[in-house]
Amino acid sequence: MLINTKKCVGCYACRMACQMINKLEPEEAFISYKEIEQGTYPSVYAETVPVQCMHCENAPCQQVCPTHATYTTDSGVVLVDEEKCIGCKYCMAACPYGVRIQIEKTGVIEKCRFCWYEGEPGNPPACVGTCISGARVFGDLDDPESDISREIARTNAQPIAGDLTESKIYYVR
């Protein structure tokens, strides 16, 4: 996924769509926002940076899970097996992005799953489809001809923390 913070208007529609499709409570969210001051006086502005699971290639959350509830699919999506999760929160502590939450009703630790359900990749995630400014692009990072690969090359998008965890979410900032 690519998130272009220059296009993001901070409307939170992506977060609301995510909450609805995942049946999350209002206080539960897989997407959070950082407001970062940019520029110098008198040309100061706030950059809205949506933050969610980065679906890391080298996922610290997966490495610490004692029950192996956190796993990576063949296509690189990091998921949580709700049947195996014991709610110990080790993965929450290990995540360098602070994007995992505990679902109050079940005690399971969850996070963005790119709207992947029942083991099958579906349409683009709800956050992409609902973005009014076109700030999000989703696709196959391994296909150099995909829209996302072309957009990453065109904009020089980078993972938010460099290659610390080999994130699969790229940002234009």
Language model features by range: what are they?
Residues 1-173:
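Non-ligating segments of multi-cofactor redox enzymes
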